[in-house]
């Protein structure tokens, strides 16, 4: 089985005349079509908003595309908040969901008018002492503990997660914050990662809807929204069926009608934070084969490395690889596709069946649009690659330049340190 890249060999050969490999390339048409579908799938809920997880793809050009479709920003750090502000997001277009939060970041988020989503019960006192009051709109992150399991066998273990509060803490926290002036309350939860099933969001929604009904009864608080967070995944392997966002939206709608409407809570807004689903399939890492090595295994060395895409090295994650121009060639070879870091886990593929790869071939590493460039780092003195946008009209636009040695040495600018290129 195979995946079809959104860029051709001929297009890449033109692109590299201006922008050398490696580079991350994003598909504007795909991003737009998907963002439109998400809005349509949840149009039944008047208050719906997708808060794009900035951590997934922190690029102003991407954020501004999503903004056209009503998306907000889910931020988890000071610099992500600063980026959201610079892109013109303001007020409740920003959700600030962080953990182990420096107090000055609460202040910055509050000054932007962002909705603050508290990760810990002790943060209630922290935020009151820092701001001088409790904001009128506030949210808490819920952790049910135990194991979260779906009928198809997908499971995760919230009880081992550092995030969120217990139900008892949220009940007590809502009571405290209501007494201190909070008027609009929300609940947030993230219970499983990269679920490739239409079942996850509806099941999570039902659990959270039942929780907020109980919260309203116990505390008398006005529940303004339920934030389903992320967790809706993408099919990294070609044998997986992609999620159907319309089926997911309808499943959440069904749970809403079954639980919230009878409780007189049909004004509750639904929020989501689907960074991976919004972007991953619409980005790829384009790299060139520059070496081959024949020892106990067959190796293809490329000009990208884990600095450009960390997921395979960090998690052992599968990313499909297409050799451009050889899409229909038989996969007769078994390769490890590797980068140049001085780490043996710097491998994009291990024992992968691929066509014969020659030096100079261009490889597309699929599904890097989220948590791809964003997770880059500078180990071994490697430099981050450029980010390019394949625009809807077919033209290519640079949306982040490649790093240079000057960037690597920039933080020594306070010393008498000189380098030569």
Regions found by a protein language model. Name each.
Residues 58, 81, 102, 124-125, ...:
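Glycine-rich nucleotide phosphate-binding loop and flanking beta-alpha elements
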Residues 52, 73-76, 96, 117-120, ...:
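General beta-strand structural signal in soluble alpha/beta enzymes
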Residues 144-291:
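Active-site loop/helix belt of alpha/beta enzymes
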Residues 11, 27-30, 34, 38, ...:
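General structural feature for long, well-ordered alpha-helical segments within catalytic domains
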Residues 260, 265-421:
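Charged (often Lys/Glu-rich) extended helix/loop segments that serve as interaction or gating elements
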Residues 31, 55, 77, 109, ...:
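Conserved, mostly hydrophobic/aromatic
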Residues 1-136, 171, 175-179, 183, ...:
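A charged N-terminal "starter" segment
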Residues 133-147:
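Glycine-rich, aromatic-flanked loop segments that form ligand/cofactor-binding clefts
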């Amino acid at each position: 089985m195979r995946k079809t890249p959104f860029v051709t060999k001929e297009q890449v050969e033109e692109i590299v005349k201006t922008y050398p490999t490696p580079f991350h390339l994003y598909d504007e048409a795909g991003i737009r079509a998907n963002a439109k579908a998400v809005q349509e799938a949840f149009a039944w809920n008047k208050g719906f908003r997708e808060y794009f997880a900035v951590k997934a793809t922190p690029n102003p050009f991407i954020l501004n595309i999503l903004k056209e479709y009503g998306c907000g920003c889910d931020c988890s750090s000071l610099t992500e908040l600063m980026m959201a502000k610079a892109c013109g997001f303001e007020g409740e277009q920003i959700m600030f969901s962080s953990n182990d939060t420096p107090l000055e970041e609460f202040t910055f988020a509050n000054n932007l008018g962002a909705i603050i989503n508290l990760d810990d019960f002790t943060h209630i006192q922290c935020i009151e002492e820092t701001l001088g009051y409790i904001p009128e709109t506030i949210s808490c992150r819920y952790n049910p503990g135990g194991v979260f399991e779906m009928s198809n066998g997908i499971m995760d273990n919230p009880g081992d997660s550092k995030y969120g509060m217990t139900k008892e803490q949220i009940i007590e926290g809502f009571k405290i914050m209501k007494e201190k002036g909070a008027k609009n309350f929300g609940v947030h939860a993230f219970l499983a990662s990269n679920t490739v099933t239409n079942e996850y969001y509806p099941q999570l929604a039902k659990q959270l809807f039942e929780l907020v009904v109980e919260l309203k009864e116990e505390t008398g608080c006005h529940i303004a929204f339920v934030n389903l967070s992320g967790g809706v995944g993408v099919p990294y392997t070609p044998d997986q069926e992609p999620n159907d966002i319309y089926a997911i939206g309808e499943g959440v709608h069904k749970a809403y009608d079954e639980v919230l409407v009878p409780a007189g809570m049909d004004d509750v807004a639904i929020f989501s934070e689907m960074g991976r689903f919004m972007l991953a399939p619409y980005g790829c890492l384009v790299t060139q084969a520059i070496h081959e090595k024949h020892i106990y295994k067959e190796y293809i060395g490329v000009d990208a490395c884990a600095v450009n895409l960390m997921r395979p090295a960090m998690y052992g994650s599968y990313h499909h690889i297409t050799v451009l121009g050889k899409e229909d060639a038989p996969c007769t070879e078994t390769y490890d596709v590797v980068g140049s870091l001085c780490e043996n886990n710097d491998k994009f593929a291990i024992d992968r069946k691929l066509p014969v790869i020659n030096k100079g071939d261009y490889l597309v590493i699929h599904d890097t649009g989220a948590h791809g460039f964003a997770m880059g780092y500078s180990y071994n003195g490697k430099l981050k690659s450029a980010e390019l946008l394949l625009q809807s009209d077919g033209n290519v636009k640079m949306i982040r330049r490649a790093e240079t040695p000057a960037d690597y040495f920039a933080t020594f600018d306070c010393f008498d340190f000189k380098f030569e290129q």
